[in-house]
Design a protein with these regions (language model features):
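Loop/turn elements at helix/coil->beta-strand transitions in domains of secreted/extracellular proteins
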Residues: 37-39, 62-64, 90-93, 223-230, ...
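Secreted/periplasmic serine-hydrolase-like ester/acetyl group-modifying domain
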Residues: 113-225, 309-339
C-alpha cells in the first residue's frame, strides 16, 4: 500500500511541476477528449497548431479533429505519438506533418546540435505525456545518452516551487485539461513576404541517412498498423532545396502506397496572400489559417470517409465550443485586417 501511495503521489507531483506551455496545453487537452470521438488527428510541430482549426472544420464539415502538436516536434517521436493516440482514439485518418523530416538534421548553432537531437524539442513531447510503457519506449529509442532525467522529469523541474502556488499548474495535476480550441493557437500579427512558386521543380534531393531511416521506420509502422495516413506539407515560404526534399519524400511515401499532399503546390487555390496572411516565413497568421483550413477540410471530405456529426446530440459541446472560439477569433481577425 505504501509503494502504491508513493507512486501515485510521485506521478501527481511530476505532473504538477511540469511548466504549462503551448505543447503541454495541446497534449493534456488531447488526454481530456472523450474516448473514440476524434475522426482525424494532426501530428507534428507548430505547422499543425497554427494552421489547422479543428473547430472551424467541425462547423463547416461536421467531422471532429485535434492537433496533437508540440513546438519543433522531432521526427523520431511521431510513431510513438501515434501509438499514444491509438490508446484512446480510432481516427479515420492521421495527418502527419513532414516538416520535422525537412528540418530535423539542420544544425542549431545555439545548442551545437542537429535539431532532432536537441533536448528541448524532445522534452516538449516526453515531458507532457502520461507516464506509460509507450513514453518509456519513446525515451529509450529517441534520446541519445543518459535517459534517467527524461524518464523522471521532476528532476528537471523540482526547483520550480512557483508551480506549487500557481492555480494554472494545479489544473494540470492529472495531466488532463480541456483544450477548448482542440490544439489550435492563432498567430495575431502580419509579416509581408515574397513567396516564390517552386511547384515546377521536379528534382529530388535525398534526405540524410538519419532522416531517411526515420521516415522508413514511420512508414513501416503505419503499414503494419494498416492505418490511413496523409503525409502533408503546409504552405510557407518554401525554398527550392526544401521542395527537392519533399519531392524525394513523396516518392518514398508512394512506395508504401500512402497519401501525400504538398499544399505549397496549391497556394493560388488556397488564396494565401503573402502581404496579409503570414505571421513569418514558416507560419500563417489567423487569416491564413482560415484559408488553409477551408482548403484542407474540403480535400479531406473529398478523399476520406469522414462523418458529419453536427446533428448528433452527443457532439453539441463541439457546436458550443465553436461559437465561443469563433467569437474570440473574430476580434483577432478584425485587428489583422486593420494592420
Amino acid at each position: 500500500m505504501f509503494v502504491l501511495c508513493f507512486s501515485v503521489l510521485f506521478v501527481l507531483l511530476s505532473y504538477l511541476y511540469r511548466p504549462v506551455t503551448t505543447s503541454r496545453e495541446n497534449i493534456c487537452g488531447f488526454y481530456a477528449e472523450k474516448k473514440n470521438t476524434l475522426d482525424m488527428v494532426y501530428i507534428g510541430g507548430s505547422a499543425c497548431y497554427v494552421y489547422w482549426e479543428p473547430l472551424a472544420a467541425y462547423d463547416k464539415y461536421g467531422f471532429t479533429s485535434y492537433n496533437f502538436a508540440t513546438d519543433a516536434m522531432p521526427p523520431q517521436v511521431i510513431r510513438y505519438c501515434m501509438e499514444e493516440i491509438l490508446k484512446t482514439q480510432s481516427p479515420e485518418v492521421f495527418l502527419v506533418d513532414l516538416r520535422p523530416f525537412q528540418y530535423g538534421d539542420l544544425y542549431d548553432e545555439v545548442t551545437s546540435s542537429v535539431n532532432y537531437k536537441r533536448e528541448a524539442p524532445i522534452r516538449n513531447v516526453t515531458d507532457n505525456m502520461n507516464y506509460s510503457v509507450n513514453r518509456a519506449a519513446m525515451i529509450e529509442n529517441c534520446v541519445e545518452g543518459e535517459t534517467a532525467a527524461y524518464h523522471f522529469d521532476i528532476a528537471k523541474y523540482h526547483s520550480l516551487l512557483i508551480s506549487l502556488i500557481t492555480p494554472r499548474n494545479w489544473g494540470y495535476i492529472t495531466n488532463r485539461h480541456p483544450m477548448r480550441s482542440k490544439g489550435f493557437h492563432a498567430c495575431e500579427s502580419v509579416e509581408e513576404l515574397y513567396i516564390e512558386d517552386v511547384s515546377h521543380i521536379k528534382e529530388k534531393q535525398r534526405l540524410s541517412e538519419e532522416m531517411d531511416d526515420l521516415l522508413t521506420e514511420l512508414l513501416e509502422y503505419c503499414k503494419n498498423k494498416e492505418q490511413k495516413v496523409l503525409f502533408i506539407v503546409h504552405a510557407y515560404q518554401i525554398s527550392e532545396e526544401d521542395q527537392k526534399k519533399y519531392n524525394y519524400m513523396e516518392e518514398r511515401i508512394a512506395e508504401y502506397g500512402m497519401d501525400y499532399l504538398n499544399t505549397n503546390d496549391y497556394a493560388e487555390e488556397i488564396g494565401l496572400e503573402p502581404s496579409a496572411d503570414f505571421y513569418n516565413r514558416d507560419h500563417v497568421n489567423l487569416l491564413g489559417a482560415d484559408k488553409y483550413t477551408k482548403f484542407l477540410g474540403e480535400y479531406l471530405v473529398r478523399n476520406y470517409t469522414l462523418p458529419d456529426k453536427r446533428n448528433d446530440s452527443a457532439y453539441r459541446r463541439w457546436t458550443q465550443e465553436y461559437k465561443e472560439w469563433n467569437g474570440r477569433m473574430e476580434e483577432i481577425r478584425e485587428t489583422l485586417r486593420l494592420d
